[in-house]
UniProtKB/Swiss-Prot annotation:
<feature type="binding site">
    <location>
        <begin position="123"/>
        <end position="124"/>
    </location>
    <ligand>
        <name>S-adenosyl-L-methionine</name>
    </ligand>
</feature>
<dbReference type="InterPro" id="IPR029063">
    <property type="entry name" value="SAM-dependent_MTases_sf"/>
</dbReference>
<dbReference type="GO" id="GO:0006744">
    <property type="term" value="P:ubiquinone biosynthetic process"/>
</dbReference>
<feature type="binding site">
    <location>
        <position position="140"/>
    </location>
    <ligand>
        <name>S-adenosyl-L-methionine</name>
    </ligand>
</feature>
<dbReference type="InterPro" id="IPR023576">
    <property type="entry name" value="UbiE/COQ5_MeTrFase_CS"/>
</dbReference>
<keyword id="KW-0489">Methyltransferase</keyword>
<feature type="binding site">
    <location>
        <position position="95"/>
    </location>
    <ligand>
        <name>S-adenosyl-L-methionine</name>
    </ligand>
</feature>
<dbReference type="Pfam" id="PF01209">
    <property type="entry name" value="Ubie_methyltran"/>
</dbReference>
<keyword id="KW-0808">Transferase</keyword>
<feature type="binding site">
    <location>
        <position position="74"/>
    </location>
    <ligand>
        <name>S-adenosyl-L-methionine</name>
    </ligand>
</feature>
<protein>
    <recommendedName>
        <fullName>Ubiquinone/menaquinone biosynthesis C-methyltransferase UbiE</fullName>
        <ecNumber>2.1.1.163</ecNumber>
        <ecNumber>2.1.1.201</ecNumber>
    </recommendedName>
</protein>
<comment type="function">
    <text>Methyltransferase required for the conversion of demethylmenaquinol (DMKH2) to menaquinol (MKH2) and the conversion of 2-polyprenyl-6-methoxy-1,4-benzoquinol (DDMQH2) to 2-polyprenyl-3-methyl-6-methoxy-1,4-benzoquinol (DMQH2).</text>
</comment>
<comment type="pathway">
    <text>Quinol/quinone metabolism; menaquinone biosynthesis; menaquinol from 1,4-dihydroxy-2-naphthoate: step 2/2.</text>
</comment>
<keyword id="KW-0949">S-adenosyl-L-methionine</keyword>
<dbReference type="GO" id="GO:0008425">
    <property type="term" value="F:2-methoxy-6-polyprenyl-1,4-benzoquinol methyltransferase activity"/>
</dbReference>
<comment type="similarity">
    <text>Belongs to the class I-like SAM-binding methyltransferase superfamily. MenG/UbiE family.</text>
</comment>
<dbReference type="InterPro" id="IPR004033">
    <property type="entry name" value="UbiE/COQ5_MeTrFase"/>
</dbReference>
């Protein structure tokens, strides 16, 4: 008898068919797109700006280079990279979610950030770019929402130039137990209430909190990047390990 069971994955704490997750995540981000920047500031007390600034500082991006801001959303990193690469460089803001991509495009154009930025709707698991194309790739608070993380990392490796680097900024595992307990209390009790009050959507922010807990910890993600082909993989814990920045190179 042929096994008819479907492959499964997690959507927050729920187990769902792999083929369903992409659509379910899409609905979350369609729902939160309009209030995404405001909620980021409220949820992190503005600290997400420091985490992103650190990521840019670690990128090594220079004038004339080509950068992929994957899962770039509303374009915080793209705006910074646009200034660094200058007129001769290029930044591609890619996101699988049409609503997030539209918000990012409108936000950056309103700020006058045009000319060296383009926008592509793309799935991280099958990036529509040539081999050895980018000098630097960043994915900020996006990898945990990808169904096949290993496949996405291999796709990023393929389109990165030799000598290029990948930076993964993502929520991770707090280093100290007291911080972990306080973080859990905030994430599961306060965060959904903020989502309900500000975005009229407690459920999406409950999923976001759950997705953080299901994401690989620092050492596991380091190993996954190495398995995908990246070398000299390291990470920096930020805010006590609530967030980590992983770096890997293609040689």
């Amino acid at each position: 008898m042929v096994d008819q069971e479907k492959e499964t994955t997690h959507f927050g704490f729920r187990t769902v068919a792999k083929e369903q997750k992409e659509g379910m995540v899409a609905e979350v981000f369609h729902s939160v797109a309009a209030k995404y920047d405001l909620m980021n500031d409220l949820m992190s007390f503005g600290v997400h700006r420091i985490w992103k600034r650190f990521t840019v500082d670690c990128s090594g991006v220079r004038r004339g280079q080509r950068v992929l801001d994957l899962a770039g959303g509303t374009g915080d990193l793209t705006a910074k990279f646009s200034r660094l690469v200058g007129e001769q460089g290029e930044v591609i803001l890619a996101d699988i979610n049409e609503s997030m991509l539209r918000m990012g495009r409108e936000k950056l154009r309103d700020k006058g950030i045009v000319g060296n930025v383009s926008y592509v709707q793309a799935n991280a698991e099958a990036l529509p770019f040539p081999d050895n194309y980018f000098d630097c790739i960043t994915i900020s608070f996006g990898l945990r929402n990808v169904t096949e993380k290993e496949k996405a990392l291999r796709s990023m490796f393929r389109v990165l130039k030799p000598g290029g680097r990948l930076l993964v900024l993502e929520f991770s595992k707090p280093l100290l137990e007291p911080l972990s307990k306080a973080y859990d209390a905030y994430s599961f009790h306060i965060l959904p209430k903020i989502g309900e009050l500000v975005a009229q959507d407690a459920e999406s922010y409950r999923y976001l909190a759950e997705s953080i807990r299901m994401h690989p910890d620092q050492e596991t993600l380091k190993g996954m990047m190495a398995d995908a082909g990246f070398e000299n993989v390291t990470y920096s814990n930020l805010t006590g390990g609530i967030v980590a920045l992983h770096r890997g190179f293609k040689f």
